[in-house]
Amino acid sequence: MSLAVTLASTSKSRRALLAAAGVEADGVAPNVDEESFRNTMRANKLPVREQAMQLAELKAMRVSAKRPGLVIGGDQMLALGDEAFDKPADLEAAKNHLRQLSGKSHTLETAIVICEDGAPIWRHLARPKLTMRPLTEDFIETYVSSCGDALLSTVGAYQLEGPGAQLFTRIEGDYFSILGLPLLPLLDYLRIRKVLPT
């Protein structure tokens, strides 16, 4: 019998990526106060990539303590230098994100941790780098107005799989990781564990 796979998240995009790749996974909310946890990590001056990894691990551990099989926890944070960006709270914050990112390169610290029986057993960190073209104020206003609240579900206030592709001049790294899930290394691990055929 194959191991059960659970995604410690209610993220529709992560579940859709798994399903499209042939991985059946239940989605379970990890019930983590992410804002408080992030604030503590930032107060301790942890690097952004370490913040993403610790939050991914916490999510997976919380759900794994209650669910059998493999539990996948993920987190993605945007790093502009040493500054971490969270998902924008509203459309005005989305505009501010885009103003700050305009004409610069940033990294999406995309962490994934798998836990089994409440303990972490596998980790992966992908660090795609994206370079945004210089954006005019008119473009930012029009872009945010046309995309609307969908931008509030992403750390950079863009969705690369849609009109967000217009924002960039260069992308280095795995497309799936940009979408929030380092899918290819995850699939490799699931094959090792015989969740997927080899």
Swiss-Prot record:
Biological processes per GO annotation: nucleotide metabolic process
GO cellular component labels: cytoplasm
Superkingdom, taxonomy of origin: Bacteria
Compartmental location: Cytoplasm
Alphabetic keyword roster: Cytoplasm, Hydrolase, Nucleotide metabolism
Assigned protein family: Belongs to the Maf family.
Protein's name according to its UniProt entry: Nucleoside triphosphate pyrophosphatase
